[in-house]
Amino acid sequence: MGKPTSSGCDWRRFLRNHWLLLSTVAAVVLGIVLGVVVRGHSELSNLDKFYFAFPGEILMRMLKLVILPLIVSSMITGVAALDSNVSGKIGLRAVVYYFSTTVIAVILGIVLVVSIKPGVTQKVNDINRTGKTPEVSTMDAMLDLIRNMFPENLVQACFQQYKTKREEVKPVGDPGGNATEVSVTTAMTTMSENKTKEYKIVGLYSDGINVLGLIIFCLVFGLVIGKMGEKGQILVDFFNALSDATMKIVQIIMCYMPIGILFLIAGKIIEVEDWEIFRKLGLYMATVLSGLAIHSLIVLPLLYFIVVRKNPFRFALGMAQALLTALMISSSSATLPVTFRCAEEKNQVDKRITRFVLPVGATINMDGTALYEAVAAVFIAQLNGLDLSIGQIVTISITATAASIGAAGVPQAGLVTMVIVLSAVGLPAEDVTLIIAVDWLLDRFRTMVNVLGDAFGTGIVEKLSKKELEQMDVSSEVNIVNPFALEPTTLDNEDSDTKKSYVNGGFAVDKSDTISFTQTSQF
């Protein structure tokens, strides 16, 4: 009498282990209800709407705060933990996986939009335009991508990235012209109304972390200090401590997440002015969401099952908190701290894999974005009554794949790359304003698919790299400078005579490939 029942213990254990996920789901529901109630019973000014969403803004700021130290520390320690040959193999496998899934997503999107034909029953004039068209040149965008891979100032790369801007050169006689404004001038001509225009290239910097440049630098830096032996030990220890401290901060931020998400959702519902646009673009949205659902529920799990031979949906359930966060905040980079935590703690993916693969995936693996761009381009062509040739469809496929890889993991990046895709096949770039009104919603779902693709990638790459990781674990020639250096430990069970385990960072790894948390775990 008085003993708790097993079912009661199970419920308490379940609530204790999943309280954050459950509270986040509850926050989403309450946010929707609160947004609908406030929208229906009061008229808020733009200033009131801004103040209402303030708690959600704080959540976004906190998550973005830890992006920089997390990417830098995880990439450097992850690469330094691996032999250069092993890191090369892991990197190649990750890139092949990213490229393959992106191509599959593009093909899936084109097949769906060609089959469903969401734009055939509508015309351009039937849909209200929203916002303005981003001014983007395909050549400038590709060159900026390469420039940002090699930042000229590492400190500046932490808060700015390079972005080219074109300015029209006024004739010498024009008092408004100034042909000597910058030292580097590129003459470009366009024919418009029988007039030749010249443009000059103005180098500018826009706010935002240059994630790609930092990843390239951290990759090289990690390889170098990994080969420095004892001289590099102090740097390895520093970045390991930085990574652990950052994840501790992430745990604190997670406690505030339900409150922030509640006001993010409610604020967005209050902010939307024209709900009629969802009816007009309903078939287009259904096409995009169907493609994202097929890719995330069938394609990615099937790839995971074929390679890993484990239940993919159990793996996806372990990433539930990260997926829900991505759905709410619409940024794969800002979701990265939560993605790390779920992959390493819930799914117990080797930290040497997550630290190397996840930052790269959050930058270049954009399956959802690629699918969306392919669908949107064909949809706009259908609205204009244009029949795309096979060559144009192939061009859309290639451009959407390349543009999604170059897109940064930030909100609304799809619109910028969308202009590139439209320009590649001669479609009017200004028609991107037709879909801006619903982009905020679709952006959340495609971000969730991007994060899910990154997560499955860690599991697949870990399985494919199992042989190399085991060789590092049991190698007799262990590099003591390695941040995941192997130290022999003893097991407190009857198999201690037949098994030998090694401390791998915060994990105990034995030859039976069983992974469990030890008292040295930092999580």
Curated annotation (Swiss-Prot):
GO terms for biological process: adult behavior; behavioral fear response; blood vessel morphogenesis; brain development; cellular response to ammonium ion; cellular response to bisphenol A; cellular response to cocaine; cellular response to mercury ion. PROSITE patterns: NA_DICARBOXYL_SYMP_1, NA_DICARBOXYL_SYMP_2. Residues 1-18, 83-93, 229-237, 308-312, 344-352, 462-523 are cytoplasmic. Na(+) 1 binds at residues 98, 101-102, 361, 365, 367, 450, 454. L-aspartate binds at residues 330, 332, 369, 410, 446-447, 450. Na(+) 2 binds at residues 363, 404-405, 407. This is Excitatory amino acid transporter 3. The lineage of its organism: Eukaryota, Metazoa, Chordata, Craniata, Vertebrata.
